[in-house]
Amino acid sequence: MLMSVSILCLFFLINPYQIMIYLMIMTLFLLAKGLINNAESFINFFFFDLMSLSMVILTVWISILMIMASKSNNNYKNKIFNFYLLLMMNLLFICFMLENLLMFYLFFEAVLFPIILMISGWGSQPERIQAGFYMLMYTVFGSLPLLILMLLKNQSLSIIFNEWLFNEMGFIFFLMILGFLVKIPMFLFHLWLPKAHVEAPRAGSMILAGVLLKLGFYGLYRFKSFFFLDLLKFSFVLIVISMWGAVLISIFCLYQNDIKSLIAYSSVSHMGITLAGCVTFQLHTSFGMLMMMIGHGLCSSGLFCLKNMIYERLHTRSIMMIKGMINFPNLSMWWFLFSIINMSAPMTMNLFGELFLGLGLMKYSLLLSLPVMMMIFLSACYSMFMYSYINHGQSWMIFSNKMISMREYYLMLLHIIPMIMWFLKINFFMKWI
């Protein structure tokens, strides 16, 4: 019934406020259903567990915030833009609940097309076509080996895998998980992400950083039981590349002049430590991975919103040009809050996420202590660098007379509240473990 309502809304719900009401009702329904029954299977190939619940709620929440954020520009009244937005939300909604692995793969790839169309059609620069092309090539060709092997080894559309299929695959194992590593994105496969973020409209950056990057972790989590032995064998290689990349990208963030690129590269850094923790298969890291996915999704979405609030008034993304925001205390307060959340300050989910990921990695090998501490330290450095450059100093630009609206205040507040509430309800995530 819920899926039929979602499909009908794709064609008949054009007013964004009606969409928001529909999404809020769906969120409440999922919360009530998920808290009452933590795992169930229905309609043969749909499956609903705590991780699915968390990802679906995050998807719906970010979609609501996307609609609120798009109200200030012409996209708000664009029916095609609203259609792509709601289509992508429904594709994600189905993807996070599918139990059939072939169907999961199809929806996993189908989610790409709405975001590529949003980047190519509503991006602000001519380079948006190149950004969409990069994203398409990396993600589609990265996941083709998985589809080919699935079809070669099993002719049934049910895709019930046999144990012998995934024993001692060696190099083929990397080809199978390449599609997930590109989506995360893992260091060395991350070049598409900064381009996509820089050229995407505000709503596109929000859903890309908030939800789409988590699809890679979700797919890895769903498929890990099929190549568990290979993951154990090659996990150290993935951990070393991920942690080394997280440290290098964190250093690179300190040299960024474009604020949107800085936020995009910080996402790559945080996803690096999350991937490293994911492949250790420990209770600490499983708990930290889920919290980091949700906390980072809300934090990065909020940072892109803040960036756009400044861009609408100063028409520049250069950190060297954006200065003196402390003269606008309300705006400066939001920058301070999201900067400390980005560096995993207390009272947020990111703190526990990085804490459990770090503990799990150190338990896996003490040699990882140094890169973990370096990554956490550098994360604090570039977050402080971003806040201090934006808020202090003499501004080179004339700030627009356009005041911060109540809609924008609510938008920022709705990013903060879930992180604090979930921080106070940590035992909700422990049910997954």
Curated annotation (Swiss-Prot):
GO cellular component, one term: mitochondrial membrane
InterPro entries associated with the record: NADH4_N, NADH_UbQ_OxRdtase, ND/Mrp_TM
Membrane topology per record: Multi-pass membrane protein
The enzyme's E.C. designation: 7.1.1.2
GO molecular function term, any single one: NADH dehydrogenase (ubiquinone) activity
Subcellular location(s) of the protein: Mitochondrion membrane
Catalytic activities: a ubiquinone + NADH + 5 H(+)(in) = a ubiquinol + NAD(+) + 4 H(+)(out)
Transmembrane portions of the chain: 10-30, 45-65, 80-100, 101-121, 132-152, 169-189, 203-223, 234-254, 261-281, 286-306, 331-353, 366-386, 410-430
Keywords assigned by UniProt, alphabetized: Electron transport, Membrane, Mitochondrion, NAD, Respiratory chain, Translocase, Transmembrane, Transmembrane helix, Transport, Ubiquinone
A Gene Ontology BP annotation from the UniProt entry: electron transport coupled proton transport
Top-level lineage group: Eukaryota
Keyword Electron transport included in the entry's annotation: yes
Family membership noted in the UniProt record: Belongs to the complex I subunit 4 family.
Protein purpose: Core subunit of the mitochondrial membrane respiratory chain NADH dehydrogenase (Complex I) that is believed to belong to the minimal assembly required for catalysis. Complex I functions in the transfer of electrons from NADH to the respiratory chain. The immediate electron acceptor for the enzyme is believed to be ubiquinone.
UniProt name for this protein: NADH-ubiquinone oxidoreductase chain 4
Native source species: Rhipicephalus sanguineus
